[in-house]
Amino acid sequence: MKYFKSALRLGIVLIIICGLIYPLFITAVGQTVFHNKANGSIVTFKGKEVGSALLGQNFTDKRFFRGRVSSVNYNTYTKNDSNKDEVASGSQNLAPSNKDLKNRVKKDIDDFLKTHPGVKKDEIPTDLLTSSGSGLDPDISPKAAEIQVPSVSKATGISQSKLKQIIKKCTEGRTLGVLGEERVNVLKVNLEVASMLKNSKIGE
């Protein structure tokens, strides 16, 4: 009986600490010190929420920079979409020899070359043709952004030098100076572009 009471008291104490005090403490710290990140890093434009800095989007308008390929369509579907994958994130995990993967990459290459005249096949950065493990990657490499500058400049009338400045402004360095690579947040870049356009669909 003595051991039972001790175990019961210990269980109650742990429930209070781990199930109440700790979660409330972490929530309080998150909401006060990291409020934006704790709430999904939501990005606003013209007073409207237009996305998250942590989640990629499928930009098809030729006036904007495109992001990485997503095997789950960035988890955005219509009710009648026959291609709905029923998964929130992930990758197809297809082998390099898989025919479906080869066909998809070929289609993406042809599409990119068509919309970016002057670019050669072997100049297309790998991250514009491959999907991330989650299918929701919001970033591309600086090289992947810069190769799109001529096309975006032509579609928007914004000078290439100005677009390169925007890319530089939205480029983040390695985490802690050593982890990962330099990256450009596609949503943030496109919002900078949208702010310079008279008519933009972003946020409308």
Swiss-Prot record:
UniProt protein name: Potassium-transporting ATPase KdpC subunit
Subcellular location: Cell membrane
Induction: By low potassium concentration.
Family note: Belongs to the KdpC family.
GO CC annotations on file: plasma membrane
Ranges for region Disordered: 81-100
Keywords: ATP-binding, Cell membrane, Ion transport, Membrane, Nucleotide-binding, Potassium, Potassium transport, Transmembrane, Transmembrane helix, Transport
Quaternary structure note: The system is composed of three essential subunits: KdpA, KdpB and KdpC.
Topology in the lipid bilayer: Single-pass membrane protein
Example of a GO MF term: ATP binding
HAMAP family: KdpC
Functional summary from the UniProt entry: Part of the high-affinity ATP-driven potassium transport (or Kdp) system, which catalyzes the hydrolysis of ATP coupled with the electrogenic transport of potassium into the cytoplasm. This subunit acts as a catalytic chaperone that increases the ATP-binding affinity of the ATP-hydrolyzing subunit KdpB by the formation of a transient KdpB/KdpC/ATP ternary complex.
Bilayer-spanning residue ranges: 10-30
